[in-house]
Amino acid sequence: MIIVYISLAVLAVSIIFLGVTVIQNKKKIDPALKELSSVTQAMQKQIEGLKTETELLTQKQKKIQQDVQIKKYTLQQTAAEVKEVPQAVKEVWQAGHFNSR
């Protein structure tokens, strides 16, 4: 019967030792977890900032692309009109030249 009591005492001491060890380890881990949490929050804020900047850059890129398309179209129209000028001058010249004879 003594062996049973000794076994129970060893079991009780083991459980107490386990509890003390768990509490000590928890106290050691808590600061690291808090630091990890704060780092994670800071990273999340940076990610949100990057997302916002990405959206702004995408909007600016679209505006620039639209502006380039408008200017390209305008330049093409101007070039087409400039190409027509020599023919128009030639026609006016010929019309004026024939009238003066």
Swiss-Prot record:
- InterPro entries associated with the record: UPF0478 (IPR009293)
Source organism, top-level taxon: Bacteria
Record-given protein name: Uncharacterized protein YoxC
Q: From what organism does this protein derive?
A: Bacillus subtilis (strain 168)
**Gene that codes for this?**
yoxC
